C-alpha cells in the first residue's frame, strides 16, 4: 500500500483462522520486551487494510505503526486498556477523526483495496459504506419510523423515479418496507412494530442501541464499526446486542471496540490487542490470542497482571 500523510480539515472455523504470531526482540520497553509482528493472511477476502498507521493529536502520538488486515463478513474485536488507541483506530476506518482539528494521520487505510485518505474521497459516501454505532445510544428525537427513514430520504436512497412508479410502489410503501426490514435485521421489529410513531427517546437503553444499529443499516453499509456498543447496557440487553452482532456478521464486516475481554472472546473471530502507547502488540485468531498468546505482554494483560 502507498503511504499517505493526512491532516484533518474538518472541526472459529478454518475459514477465519490465521497464522500464529511470531515476535522478535527489538529492545526493551519499560519492563517488557517489545514484539514486532508480521501481517496475517486470511482464507477470506480482506475488506479493510491498514498499513503503518500513525495518528497524532497535536504533538501527542495516539497510534504507532499499526498494520493489519480485516477480513470481510466477520467480527474483529479491538481490546486493550483505556487510552491505548482502540477508539482512535476505529475512527480512522471511516475518517471520523477528520472532525478533530488537531489530528494528523500518516499511513494507509484501504476499503476494498481503495485508499480512503486520498484526495477526492466523498466522505458522505464513505460513511454510508462504513457506518458507526457509538458507545451511548443516540437516537434522533423523532419517531422510531423517522429514525430509520431519515438517512435514506436525506441521501435520496428511496427511489422516487420512473422505475418505482412503473412497479406501482409509492414512496410511502418503499419507506415502510425499509423501516420493517431494518428493524427486523436489528431484532427490534417485534418489540416496536405497533408503535412506530412513538418518540424513539421513550425506548429502553437496549432498544435505543438496537434502533441505532437499524438506522445504520438503513443506508446499506458494508462495514459496521461499533465503539463499546453494550457498555451502558444491562446483561439482558447486552446479550441481545451480542446475538445481533453474530447475525450481522453473516452479511456485514463488523469491527468492535470492547473493554470486556469475555465479550471479545464470545463474539469475535479475530482479536487485536492494543497496549499503552498506541501499539498493536498482537493480532490473530481469537481462540489463540486468549488461550495461547505469543506476546508476554498480552498474556499479562489478559490474565489481569496489568491494565
UniProtKB/Swiss-Prot annotation:
It comes from the Archaea. Its EC number is 7.3.2.1. It is found in: Cell membrane. Residues 48-302 form the ABC transporter domain. Gene3D superfamilies: P-loop containing nucleotide triphosphate hydrolases. It is a peripheral membrane protein. One of its GO terms (biological process) is phosphate ion transmembrane transport. Residues 1-30 are annotated as: Disordered. One of its GO terms (molecular function) is ATP binding. It catalyses: phosphate(out) + ATP + H2O = ADP + 2 phosphate(in) + H(+). The keyword Cell membrane applies. Keywords: ATP-binding, Cell membrane, Membrane, Nucleotide-binding, Phosphate transport, Translocase, Transport. PROSITE patterns: ABC_TRANSPORTER_1, ABC_TRANSPORTER_2, PSTB. ATP binds at residues 80-87. GO terms for cellular component: plasma membrane. SUPFAM superfamilies: P-loop containing nucleoside triphosphate hydrolases. InterPro entries: AAA+_ATPase, ABC_transporter-like_ATP-bd, ABC_transporter-like_CS, P-loop_NTPase, PstB-like. The complex is composed of two ATP-binding proteins (PstB), two transmembrane proteins (PstC and PstA) and a solute-binding protein (PstS). Belongs to the ABC transporter superfamily. Phosphate importer (TC 3.A.1.7) family. Part of the ABC transporter complex PstSACB involved in phosphate import. Responsible for energy coupling to the transport system. This is Phosphate import ATP-binding protein PstB. It comes from Haloquadratum walsbyi (strain DSM 16790 / HBSQ001). The gene is pstB.
Amino acid at each position: 500500500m502507498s503511504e499517505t500523510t493526512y491532516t484533518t480539515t474538518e472541526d472459529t472455523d478454518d475459514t477465519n483462522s490465521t497464522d500464529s504470531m511470531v515476535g522478535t526482540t527489538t529492545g526493551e520497553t519499560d519492563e517488557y520486551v517489545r514484539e514486532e509482528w508480521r501481517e496475517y493472511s486470511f482464507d477470506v477476502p480482506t475488506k479493510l487494510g491498514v498499513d503503518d498507521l500513525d495518528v497524532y493529536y497535536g504533538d501527542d502520538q495516539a497510534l504507532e505503526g499499526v498494520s493489519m488486515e480485516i477480513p470481510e463478513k466477520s467480527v474483529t474485536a479491538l481490546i486493550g486498556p483505556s487510552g491505548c488507541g482502540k477508539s482512535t483506530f476505529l475512527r480512522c476506518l471511516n475518517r471520523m477523526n477528520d472532525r478533530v482539528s488537531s489530528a494528523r494521520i500518516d499511513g494507509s487505510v484501504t476499503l476494498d483495496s481503495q485508499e480512503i485518505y486520498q484526495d477526492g474521497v466523498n466522505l458522505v459516501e464513505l460513511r454510508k459504506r462504513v457506518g458507526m454505532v457509538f458507545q451511548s445510544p443516540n437516537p434522533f428525537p423523532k419517531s422510531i419510523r423517522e429514525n430509520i427513514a431519515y438517512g435514506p430520504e436525506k441521501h435520496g436512497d428511496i427511489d422516487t423515479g420512473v422505475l418505482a412508479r412503473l412497479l406501482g410502489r409509492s414512496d410511502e410503501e418503499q419507506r415502510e418496507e425499509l423501516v420493517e426490514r431494518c428493524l427486523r435485521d436489528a431484532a427490534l421489529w417485534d418489540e416496536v412494530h405497533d408503535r412506530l410513531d412513538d418518540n424513539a427517546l421513550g425506548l429502553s437503553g437496549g432498544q435505543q442501541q438496537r434502533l441505532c444499529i437499524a438506522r445504520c443499516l438503513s443506508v446499506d453499509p458494508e462495514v459496521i464499526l461499533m465503539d463499546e456498543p453494550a457498555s451502558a447496557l444491562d446483561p439482558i440487553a447486552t446479550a441481545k446486542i451480542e446475538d445481533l452482532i453474530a447475525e450481522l456478521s453473516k452479511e456485514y464486516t463488523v469491527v468492535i471496540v470492547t473493554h470486556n475481554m469475555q465479550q471479545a472472546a464470545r463474539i469475535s473471530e479475530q482479536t487485536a490487542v492494543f497496549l499503552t502507547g498506541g501499539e498493536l502488540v498482537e493480532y490473530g485468531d481469537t481462540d489463540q490470542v486468549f488461550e495461547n498468546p505469543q506476546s508476554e505482554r498480552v498474556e499479562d494483560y489478559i490474565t489481569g497482571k496489568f491494565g
